[in-house]
């Protein structure tokens, strides 16, 4: 039987050993956080297209290869993902950098790195005869996303710049949910529609043509470069303490994109997730995703984004960007470039 003195001595040295470990972790600072906090919780829309990329990352173990344990949290709405991030329930979501700048102006330390260039287009009905913004005057135009939808604001700015037309005053605006707007233009109840890219892809599969893409609008309005509007968004303080996790996930995202760009077999594997009813829809969705892959992200793209923010601010005002009309420093996380 061990004496109480022996037990106490062992306890003392054990406590001393763990105290040393604790002091080392304190000295490591942010590195200590990275050492233990390997899980990354990403909230996405349940049926969002980002699920395709995350599926590839998980299926091929790309995140695991970076030492990141990826947990995908599927939610019912965009607002739900934002609430999850702001409450700390998840670490990352996918949204646009205009929202990030607005949140930073309100004191939130959110930041962004790119996910996709894909945003949408202005599509016209078959046989509509619409070939210019002038032809849109007096027509019924469906708009997804509401009065301060960024695609709608960019189209308005482009119409004013190219043809001197105030679209906001000259078209009959019909705001609605993306699937409903697609149904209405296909049934002849709308003359044109502005919708998100994956809904546009489904319209292309039905033979509809774009009057203008949002990507073209961005470049024409003076950005001078394609600007990724959508990206992975997270808290700056958390990211700075967990750079290995964020940068590792970013590499796994790029790796998934590269595989999708090169492998038709990978798309065939994903097809059940894409809800494509026929080959034309499947091909349009695939091509739309691939067209949205950013090729570079550096000083040029960041500068272009700031110029685009000025255009959006002029069109949407405080209803879009919040109380500050200035693009907020730190909106783009500086530790990822390519």
Feature annotation, model-predicted:
Residues 3-20:
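Bacterial N-terminal signal peptides that target proteins for export
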Residues 18-30:
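Bacterial N-terminal signal peptides
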Residues 31-37:
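Sec/Tat signal peptide C-region and signal peptidase I cleavage site
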Residues 38-175, 184-187, 191-197, 211:
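Short, glycine-/small- and polar/acidic-enriched structural segments
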Residues 65, 215-225, 291-301:
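Short, solvent-exposed loop/beta-turn-alpha elements that line the ligand-binding surface or hinge
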Residues 97-98, 174, 179-272:
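Pocket-lining segment of extracytoplasmic ligand-binding domains
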Residues 239-316:
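Secondary-structure end/capping motifs
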Residues 306-338:
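Conserved C-terminal helix/tail region of periplasmic/extracytoplasmic solute-binding proteins
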């Amino acid at each position: 039987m061990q004496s109480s003195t022996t037990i106490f001595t062992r306890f003392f040295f054990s406590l001393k050993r763990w105290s040393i470990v604790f002091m080392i972790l304190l000295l490591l600072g942010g590195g200590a956080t990275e050492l233990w906090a390997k899980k990354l919780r990403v909230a996405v829309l349940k049926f969002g297209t980002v699920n395709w990329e995350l599926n590839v990352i998980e299926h091929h173990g790309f995140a695991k290869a970076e030492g990141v344990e990826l947990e995908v949290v599927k939610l019912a709405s965009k607002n739900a993902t934002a609430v999850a991030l702001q409450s700390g329930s998840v670490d990352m979501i996918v949204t646009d950098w205009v929202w990030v700048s607005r949140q930073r102006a309100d004191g939130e330390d959110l930041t962004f790195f790119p996910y996709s260039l894909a945003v949408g287009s202005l599509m016209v009905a078959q046989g509509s005869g619409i070939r210019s913004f002038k032809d849109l005057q007096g027509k019924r135009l469906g708009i997804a996303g509401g009065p301060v939808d960024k695609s709608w604001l960019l189209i308005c700015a482009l119409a004013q710049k190219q043809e001197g037309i105030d679209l906001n005053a000259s078209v009959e605006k019909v705001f609605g949910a993306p699937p409903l707007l697609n149904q209405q233009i296909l049934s002849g109840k709308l003359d044109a529609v502005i919708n998100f890219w994956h809904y546009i892809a489904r319209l292309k599969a039905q033979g509809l043509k774009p009057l203008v893409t949002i990507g073209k609008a961005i470049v024409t309005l003076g950005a001078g470069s394609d600007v990724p509007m959508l990206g992975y968004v997270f808290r700056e303080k958390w990211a700075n303490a967990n750079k290995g996790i964020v940068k590792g996930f970013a590499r796994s995202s790029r790796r998934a994109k590269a595989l999708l760009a090169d492998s038709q077999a990978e798309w065939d594997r994903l097809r059940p997730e894409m809800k494509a009813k026929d080959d034309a829809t499947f091909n349009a969705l695939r091509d739309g995703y691939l067209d949205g892959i950013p090729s570079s992200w550096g000083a040029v793209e960041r500068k272009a984004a700031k110029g685009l923010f000025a255009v959006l601010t002029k069109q949407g005002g405080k209803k879009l960007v919040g109380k500050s009309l200035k693009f907020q420093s730190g909106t783009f996380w500086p530790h990822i470039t390519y």
